[in-house]
């Protein structure tokens, strides 16, 4: 059994909370894409764990955890995050954590050039704005991967006598291309090489052939949960390009990032915030640059876990949700942070885009067009009462249930979970009919 949790908007939907709720049922939790540019927090028994690169399954003592071939690994951050978790009591994390030998390595010079690329890419955008990178070196690493000059984990940990020489030569060639690309590029290559000589032995116990690892688990009928990073609207192919991340963050990234066939995936859970947020630049049709937007930001505490940047806020956009569902094929939805809407008298929902008076059939790929659309809204009545103490779906206010029903009917996917507050216990389960 393979189930997948994916973000349905622009990230920060609260995927970690659903994973936290589900993880106790799974034998293996895997990440398939991204690096330490993601970020979410899980609270267990009053202890707060911050995850960026590592799978959330580490909080479950019975789960194995895998960073798949589609993940990019910044080794210093890997060990720092692992050590932070260990200091908070996850003492057996090292025994339950594995890394794909095919995963690519993020070097410090990737992070150094990330900001330089940000300045260049701003010139390629439609309005001269920055892309909004986290500066973690993720994009440059995927770029070297695509250009076939990247360095994989197995290049570092290989036991062949000449393996270090091969790794060092690859590293110097890769660094030289950075210097040629960016001119006067001062960098302590010898210092980083010395650190990686130590990492060679430190990393080795974690490394596995992830294709063999995954398929053995599937053949053994293990319960597997795939934890998606970012979200569909940040996908390199299907997101608001170029204001996206550098990997496939939808269902395609699960398949390519773990080396598994589509037929083994049983359920795909889409996580969607009850309103919409976005970090960084790029078009945002339902954004509210007014008191409503400020209220959503304040009540929702909308600041990024990884960057600390304030998130832009707006109403729920069901045009995006339909598009996201079309690509990812969600079998059920988790609506998060519904409680943030508790005090609103009326709640608009974006249900259509108009461009030059014509209604668009689908979310457009043209950002110039997207930046000029007029949004059609359906205004629903609010419930204006506190839902944070609700523990059963039937006990939600009628208008809250009507809000959820409207989403289900419009998108064509049942809602299975509803987030009703910030605590890990603030999640209401709704029975659905599975086909």
From Swiss-Prot:
A GO MF label: adenylosuccinate synthase activity
Entry EC no(s): 6.3.4.4
Gene Ontology CC terms: cytoplasm
Gene Ontology biological process terms, A to Z: 'de novo' AMP biosynthetic process; IMP metabolic process
Pfam families with a match to the protein in the record: Adenylsucc_synt
InterPro entries: Adenylosuccin_syn_GTP-bd, Adenylosuccin_syn_Lys_AS, Adenylosuccinate_synth_dom1, Adenylosuccinate_synth_dom2, Adenylosuccinate_synth_dom3, Adenylosuccinate_synthetase, P-loop_NTPase
Binding of Mg(2+), residues: 12, 39
Record-linked SUPFAM superfamilies: P-loop containing nucleoside triphosphate hydrolases
Entry binding sites for GTP: 11-17, 39-41, 311, 337-339, 419-421
Transmembrane segments: none
Reactions mediated catalytically: IMP + L-aspartate + GTP = N(6)-(1,2-dicarboxyethyl)-AMP + GDP + phosphate + 2 H(+)
Main function: Plays an important role in the de novo pathway and in the salvage pathway of purine nucleotide biosynthesis. Catalyzes the first committed step in the biosynthesis of AMP from IMP.
Entry protein name: Adenylosuccinate synthetase
